[in-house]
Amino acid sequence: MSLTALIQFRRFRIFSLYPQRERLFVRKIIVLLLAACGFGSSVLAQGLAGDWIGEMNGSFKVRIHFERVSSGFKGVLINPSGNETVLDQITSDGTHLHFAVDKLNLSYDGVWSEEESAWKGSLKFQQNYPLVLKRATAEEMAPAAHKRPQEDAINAGPAPYAQREVRFNNFAGHNQLSGTLSLPNGEGPFPGVVLVSGTGHNTRDEDVWGHKVFLVLADALNRKGFAVLRYDKRGVGGSSGDYDAATTADFASDAEAAVAWLRTQTQIDASRVGVLGHSEGGIIAPAVAAADKSVAFVVMIAGPCIRGDKLFVLQSAMTAKAYGAPDGYIASRKVFDQELYSAILSAPSELDALDRARELVAKGVAGKIVDANEAETLPKDVSRPWERYFLAYDPAPTLARLTVPVLALNGSLDVQVPAKENLAAAREALKKNSKATVMELAGMNHLLQEAKTGAPNEYNDIEETMSPTALKIITDWLSENVLRRGHEPTS
């Protein structure tokens, strides 16, 4: 993955898509990652124009293009998709090179090495770290083409199920939701699954990092004999409503409306309708089941099971560690996050929360824990309704109320909803539910992909959208616990 791709990374938060301030926070983490791994760039002034490439840890690649202009040089970083980030302050006297990315408080200084035909220098961010760049071929500069074999197979068809566009109302939320209902071949009635996506402006397919997670998941469920309803989140795609004003409780209200609508369909067995949620959806699924006793089952994929503020602190530290940030920064940021979230939780109003956040962020900037770009948006983001609600929400009491079959899955490499802490909380909350299954899937990340580190920058580069092993565990569990009568899949 290129430097620009990393800089443009927007943290999943705990789920699928990401508030603006997560992007700014992760930019700082990414810079630390690049520094720790020796990332930089340089070029001989006489031949500076053209393409250059560097590699970090054998996998992360940075591509740079320089052009000569009347005032000197201009340059960009190019990510695998071809998106560019402008470099600042590019200067070279023939043997030395300097450039900066001002908005990240990052700079590079290098010296030309005749022996290696490369720039050897240091990336500066709080301290200095080594880096080397060499000339790049056209092939090396080409945008990476990521294969999606599971999605390609689905699109190639034919499929043993039918799909149709649907709309349903959430009268409590005063909005209408648009989605896709997919039904296995046959007469039915079929057990039904409502898919609930994670945080962010997600469509019905949960399009994240170049993957269509719910497309692949729905296909697997349909082939096992389940009807599936997936929908665009409020304010996204074909759904109405105000996304930005919503909290997790509002998204849960939408999921409740989806369950109620699905039960009314003639080909659905209303007694066997359940909810499957990913990430934030993994909080919503048990909340819907606790509020509606007729929900037949719950599946939680990477669903948080500890209070929001504790999760965010843990997530921040583990994500930074996965990116290779220095231990000192991780420790300092943990203290800062704890103090910030405590202040937000104790604030009596959104305005008070904003004021307290501004004070703490100013201290964070002075202590070089928060950079200037993050400081612009962080106070507003952490004081908004969604964040304040989530910070205070503890999923465990809701889980403890469930008596229906529950499957809770986390990947061992998940850095956004870490398996150890969250599954321990799930086991404790569900200990009286004999129908609950809690599993940690070895070597899998937040999307249940087979991964190396679990860091979010791997998601796009991994070809599989969801591990076939994980899909089999989910569908086998549902077959055992739900699919006891009625239609059997034709293929």
Locations of regions flagged by a protein language model:
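Central antiparallel beta-sheet cores of small beta-barrel/beta-sandwich binding domains
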Residues: 46-114, 118-127, 160, 166
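Short beta-strand/loop motif that positions the catalytic acidic residue
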Residues: 402, 408-410
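Short alpha-helix in the alpha/beta-hydrolase fold that links the catalytic acid
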Residues: 404, 418-429
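Alpha/beta-hydrolase active-site loop
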Residues: 245-266
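Conserved alpha/beta-hydrolase
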Residues: 216-238
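Accessory cap/linker subdomain of secreted extracellular hydrolases
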Residues: 299-401
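N-terminal cap/lid segment of alpha/beta-hydrolase-fold proteins
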Residues: 142-188
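Short substrate-entry loop that stabilizes the transition state in hydrolases
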Residues: 188-190, 199-223, 308, 415-416
